[in-house]
């Protein structure tokens, strides 16, 4: 987990290993497939807060340089480094390809699919992260177990058998999935006094 201390779980406890992450079975399979095929150019697509950057970091074995497009000009990039570039949606084709040539592995993060904007000979494999996060019982069990671990880690007291607690976890999933950032934020908001405070459902 990250060493910085902001008081925000979503920042302070950002996973630094795959084992610490909330991955669906579909995400695990896709990650293994991408790693097995040793793909060097990947675009990860999805809405805000669902974990695109974390998935990209896992793909780069947490060794990638994470940059926003605005930081490119002032950041030296070693050719051997993996670069994870955020905010790529508005970049023109030529700029995307120029960026790709600056690193051994290039992972682009976008909110929309940009694969059709890149030259066929330099195409990026697109991964739609939301498609790997189905809203089903398996995904619910994954997020529930992840949140129980987060609560334990933060020494938050809760009664796992309490009906309201169970309903609150289900409600977080129903209303916010697949926005992992918001799920963790809302979990922290319900645990401010050191114990879980259920909101009647």
What is each residue range found by the language model?
Residues 1-38, 61-62:
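A short, basic N-terminal segment
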Residues 37-55:
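Walker A/P-loop nucleotide-binding motif
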Residues 60-70:
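Post-Walker A helix-loop "phosphate-sensing" segment adjacent to the P-loop in P-loop NTPases
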Residues 68-95, 100:
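Conserved P-loop NTPase "ATPase switch" module shared by AAA+ and STAND
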Residues 165-166, 174-188:
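The conserved phosphate-sensing helix
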């Amino acid at each position: 987990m990250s060493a910085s201390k902001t008081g925000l779980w979503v920042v302070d406890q950002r996973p630094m290993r795959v084992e610490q992450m909330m991955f669906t079975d579909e995400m695990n399979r896709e990650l293994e497939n991408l790693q097995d095929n040793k793909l060097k150019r990947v675009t990860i697509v999805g809405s805000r807060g669902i974990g695109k950057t974390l998935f990209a970091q896992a793909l780069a074995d947490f060794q990638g340089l994470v940059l926003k497009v605005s930081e490119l000009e002032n950041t030296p990039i070693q050719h051997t480094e993996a670069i994870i570039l955020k905010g790529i949606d508005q970049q023109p084709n030529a700029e995307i390809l120029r960026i790709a040539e600056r690193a051994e592995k290039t992972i682009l993060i976008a909110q929309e699919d940009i694969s059709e904007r890149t030259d066929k000979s330099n195409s990026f494999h697109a991964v739609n992260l939301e498609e790997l996060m189905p809203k089903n019982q398996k995904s619910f069990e994954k997020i529930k177990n992840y949140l129980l671990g987060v609560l334990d880690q933060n020494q938050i007291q809760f009664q796992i058998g309490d009906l309201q607690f169970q309903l609150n976890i289900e409600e977080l999933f129903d209303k916010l999935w697949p926005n992992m950032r918001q799920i963790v934020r809302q979990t922290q908001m319900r645990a401010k006094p050191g114990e879980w405070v259920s909101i009647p459902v």
